[in-house]
Structure formats: C-alpha cells, structure tokens
Design a protein with these regions (language model features):
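Regulatory N- and C-terminal appendages and interdomain linkers associated
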Residues: 1-37, 51-54, 308-339
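An alpha-helical support segment within catalytic cores of ATP-dependent transferases
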Residues: 9-26, 159-216
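Active-site acidic catalytic loop and adjacent metal/ATP-binding pocket
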Residues: 33-59, 199-246
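ATP-binding glycine-rich loop module of kinase domains
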Residues: 45-79, 132-136
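Conserved kinase catalytic-core helix
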Residues: 85-92, 119-164
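Short beta-strand micro-motifs within the conserved protein kinase catalytic domain, predominantly
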Residues: 95-109
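Conserved short submotifs of the Hanks-type protein kinase catalytic core
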Residues: 108-120
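Active-site activation/catalytic loop segments of kinase-like enzymes and analogous catalytic loops
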Residues: 245-284, 297-314
Length: 339
C-alpha cells in the first residue's frame, strides 16, 4: 500500500515542483533515494532535481494496517494542519527550524514537507557517552542550548493566556503513578522521597503557568541538529494550546531516562539538561515545578513500560528492574528537599 501512495506523491510533486521552486530552473527528475520504516509509518527521502540544483523532501506515509484508510487520512490531516500552523507562525516572525509543507497530501494518508537534514540530538548524546572526549569539544552543550532556545521561541511565538496551576492536582497524579509503580518494585522509601520532595518543591511554586502551542513529543530523538541550528519535523501530537512546561519536562525526562543505559552517565545527561534549561530561561521558581513535572513523566515512562507486550518475558523483567533502580536514583537525586 505504501508503495502505491509514494508513487502518487511522486506524481503530484512532478506536477507542482515548478510552482514550489520557481527559481530552480527546469525540472529534471523526482526520485526516491531511500526510506525508513517506523512502527506506524514510513519516512521516504525524496530528491527533486532541477537544472540549478536539487531539493530534498521528506514524505511521511502512515500505515493503514492498524486504523484503516480513513484513520490514517484523519491522522495525516491533523498533522498537516499542525505543521501548516506552526510553519506560518514561524515564517511571520522570521524564525527557523520548522519544515515548509509542500501541499496537502492527507487524502493519501501522508504528510510531505521539505527535509531538515541533520542528526538527532539523541544520537549526539549517545556518541558523547560512548566516545571519550567527544563531549569536551562543546558540540553537545551547544546543541542542547540550541534546543532550549528553539523551544522557548516556539512557546513565545504561540503564547496564550497563562493557565491556573493547582499543585494538589499534580500531587494527586504523582500519588496515582507511585501506586501503579509500586507493584513493579518501586519501594516505599522512594515513594516517600518523591511525594515529600514534590510537596516541598510545589509549596514555593506559582499559581499560574504559561500556556502556548505544545508539541507533546519534544524529545532528543525528535530534535534534529543541523548546521544552522535545530529543527523539529514531527507535529503529529501537537496541540494549539496547552501547558508550555509539559514540553520542557518531557525533554528533560527523556534525556535523564537515557541513564538507564550503563554507558550513559549523569555527567553527560546533566550537561544536556543544564544547558537546555538555561537556554530556555526558566527561573528558580519555575525550575522547582519543572523538577516535579519531570518526575511525573519519568514515572509515566516506568508505568507504560510494564504494560508493553513483550515476546520475551526475560526482557520485560530486565526492563522493569533497570527502570526501578533508575527511578529510585532519580527520586533521591531530584526530589529530595535538599536538592
């Protein structure tokens, strides 16, 4: 099915290429140069050749096997609208890092845009963890800082009225998550540390927090580092309005969760989080709230991980044990009142 869809996308791009790139000269070819299979979609790498050069295009084609053709059309339509909205906002403010959409391909269950060429920030973090001295050249910290600056720009460009913040609701969420994780071995001492630390941190927090468009999937895997800065290519889960700090907490938790790999230590993830948070510009009161929000995301990761269907029971048990130790360490480090 995906092969038929990409053929149709290819044909559409042949018809629209000269309108999309009026100064590129004569159209020579539109070719597929590679593809990457994902769980629910394919990413096709498309090259449009002109007399004066070439343009790279990313075509995201959703699989219809899970939710049917109508389902993938609806998903693609939502993502295409999100991408168009985000791109128009950034274009008006002369900001970069959001790919230009090249038309509405949602009837094919696809999203097509210019390609942002670069390396995922997570790959850079892993390289720094595996190669001694790699992080000493400043590239890792600079990339994390760029990610923080980009997210701050995104939230400022789409800012809305602040939302009321109720610490008791957040504490209730944490308590529920702790109960869910207790069955997998999260001990009472770690739970006490989490809840006591959270209550202490939230006692000095704000009563209103910023809101804006939120990506809901701002992770180091989705942050593409390129020569001119960073870019984000996935807008499937974006919402036009939501709590801005949710994106910040998601990023920091995703970075910290990489410590579950034995070769990725705290010195690496700490550098990334510190540089990112400094560039984002959160003050001390906001950072206290973010520490609690980050712990909520980490606990959610632990709870989700134990529900994943796994063919090998041993792998599932190993995941639970690794995450249990990691959550206990993270709680002691981040949630203790003295932290």
């Amino acid at each position: 099915m995906a092969e038929n869809v990409i053929d149709q996308i290819q044909a559409e791009l042949r018809n629209s290429a000269l309108q999309l790139y009026p100064n590129a000269g004569e159209l020579r070819n539109v070719r597929i140069v590679g593809h990457t299979p994902k769980t629910d979609h394919f990413i096709y790498d498309v090259c449009i050749d002109f007399a004066n050069g070439s343009e790279r295009v990313a075509a995201k084609v959703y699989r219809s096997s899970k939710c049917g053709q109508q389902g993938v059309r609806a998903i693609a339509k939502t993502e295409n609208e999100n991408l168009g909205y985000a791109y128009s906002v950034f274009e008006k403010k002369d900001l970069a890092g959001i790919p230009r959409p090249l038309g509405d391909f949602s009837t094919f269950g696809a999203v097509v845009s210019e390609k942002i060429s670069g390396l995922p920030l997570q790959s850079i973090i892993m390289k720094a963890a595996l190669l001694p001295g790699f992080a000493d050249h400043g590239g890792l910290v600079a990339s994390a800082r760029k990610a923080g600056e980009w997210l701050r720009s995104f939230h400022k460009a789409t800012a809305d009225m602040p939302e009321p913040f109720d610490p008791e609701v957040l504490l209730s969420d944490l308590e529920s998550l702790c109960v869910n994780c207790r069955g997998e071995g999260l001990d009472d001492a770690a739970i006490r540390t989490i809840l006591t630390g959270a209550r202490h941190l939230l006692s000095r927090g704000k009563r209103a927090l910023p809101s804006s468009a939120v990506l809901n999937d701002f992770t180091p895997l989705n942050v593409i580092v390129c020569e001119s800065g960073v870019g984000i290519t996935d807008y499937a889960r974006m919402a036009r309005r939501g709590p801005s700090f949710g994106d910040v907490a998601m990023f920091m938790a995703s970075v910290e969760a990489l410590e579950k790999y034995p070769f990725c230590n705290r010195s690496i993830t700490g550098q990334v989080q510190d540089a990112f948070l400094e560039a984002y510009g959160a003050n001390s009161s906001e950072q206290a709230i973010l520490r609690v929000l980050k712990m909520r995301v980490l606990l959610s990761m632990f709870a989700r991980g134990r529900n994943v269907k796994e063919s090998a029971v041993r792998k599932k048990v190993m995941w639970a044990n690794v995450m249990k130790r990691f959550i206990q360490q993270a709680a002691q480090r981040s949630m203790s009142p003295a932290a």
